[in-house]
Amino acid sequence: MKSLLIIALLVSVVYILLCSLAYFFQEKLIFFPEKLDKDYKFVFPQRFEEITIQADDHEILHGLLFKSKNAKGLIFYLHGNAGSLAGWGGVAEVYTDLQYDVFLLDYRGYGKSDGRIESENELFKDVQSAYSQMLKYYEEKNIIILGYSIGTGLAAKTAAENSAKMLILQSPYYSLTDIVKHAVPIIPPFLLRYKLKTFEYLKDCKMPVVLIHGDKDEVIPYNQSLKLKPLLKTNDVFITLRGQAHNGMTENPDYIKEIQKILAE
């Protein structure tokens, strides 16, 4: 009996330690930024300019604005949880070829952006600051918000609180809590400080919504989009990319065909 009590105590201590680590270090478990020197030189085939945005707390955020000839509007792009614009900037060409300018934001702590991510609300405010800055240059009726992977929750939140032309979500999740619950079921959901409730934000999106997901996604399972599908409005669009994994979606010829049709409307 004494041995069982000792084992139970040890298991409890390990579990409490694991939960504590998950709570206090979750930024390191969710976000994987690549830092760039301030004098880093970006190289891309199309025209672009570097943009700085002052966040609410006066940290300076960094973005890239890619320019298209005879642009019909702007793609406001929110990228995934790893890397920086040094890599993510490569997606812009797909959209500039379709006559859309593209703005990409590096979240705080990513690329040349100052600071570090410390809260969900801070992230929301940063994205809104960048969006508000783009409104100085583009009419909102011509702005499409596009989120990829972890950026989908941020994109849906931003769309819910603004009046963009359209919302496009690539590999979205029902909520970050739901992802963690299935990936690491021993961690209580209440410990997660980044909820990113895409399902709640979609309910407030009045603009057309497009969900695009690969059915072989090994990072954000395809069933996450299937859970979101019932929340779509009558004229919203749900697209399945057969055989598509999590990475490389933008280069998928089927994705390009679908996005051509969507942006031609």
What residue spans do the PLM features occupy?
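An N-terminal hydrophobic leader/cap segment in hydrolases
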Residues: 7, 11-54
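Membrane-embedded segments
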Residues: 56-133
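Primarily recognizes the serine-hydrolase "nucleophile elbow" in alpha/beta-hydrolase
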Residues: 133-184
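Short alpha-helix in the alpha/beta-hydrolase fold that links the catalytic acid
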Residues: 198, 207, 221-230
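Short beta-strand/loop motif that positions the catalytic acidic residue
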Residues: 205, 211-213, 217
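Acidic catalytic loop of the alpha/beta-hydrolase fold
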Residues: 216-220, 246-247
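Catalytic histidine-centered segment of alpha/beta-hydrolase-like enzymes
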Residues: 244-254
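Catalytic active-site module of serine/aspartate enzymes centered on a nucleophile-bearing elbow/loop
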Residues: 252-265
